[in-house]
Amino acid sequence: ADMAAAGFADIMDGRMTPAQAGCFLMGLRMKGETPLEMAHAVGIALGRANRVEGLEGDCIDVVGTGGDGRNSFNCSTATALTLAGMGYRVVKHGNRAVSSSCGSADALEGLGFPLDVAPEDVRRLLDERNFAFLFAPNFHPSFRNVGPIRRELGIRTLFNLLGPLINPARPTHILLGVARPELVELLAETLRQSHIRKAAVV
């Protein structure tokens, strides 16, 4: 797990070439990521994120791993907006589509939601409308080294699994959808080692 953590940090900090990063990610995928490796990666990513401060009380993220390869409906975004309309405080963290036709950012942008929300805007948005969307590239500058590699590989990697776990607002609750049943235990065990108070992995 320590070697995997060091490799992940090297990718995040741009110390690996694209070829090296691709081999590392493929190796982890073939071996199978462990909850401890995932927990280390979560900590490394959150440590490099633009953190959201000053949130009080409970809030939830509704998010999915994506990558099911079926061009399926983005139900996490619809669910998040429904919960916000019901009065729950939703701080959704997401990105544009990588392996599908519509990621959460694409859907919300199409509905007129801004993608340029800054860390200091999140509390106000939650107070005003119970909903804030954190566009991942604005909060994870170190991920700029990762996007081209993910697109070139074109398959699920550690980063598909990691994205839903690294909300810089550090919500107290999470509803996490997975693309395949075999991912449920891995992500549930990873969340057990995180800051999340309550989680449902479906």
Where are the regions that the model predicts?
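Electropositive phosphate-/nucleotide-binding environments in soluble metabolic enzymes
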Residues: 2-5, 15-22, 32-39, 73, ...
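Short beta-strand segments at enzyme active-site cores
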Residues: 20-21, 91-93, 201
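Hydrophobic pocket-lining residues that define ligand/cofactor binding sites across diverse proteins
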Residues: 28, 83, 191
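Glycine-rich anion-binding loops and their surrounding alpha/beta cores
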Residues: 43, 47-52, 72, 87, ...
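A generic, well-ordered mixed alpha/beta core segment in the N-terminal half of proteins
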Residues: 64, 68-125
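Acidic, glycine/proline-rich low-complexity segments that act as flexible tails and inter-domain linkers
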Residues: 1-71, 86
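Conserved short-loop catalytic and cofactor-binding motifs
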Residues: 29, 95-96, 171-175
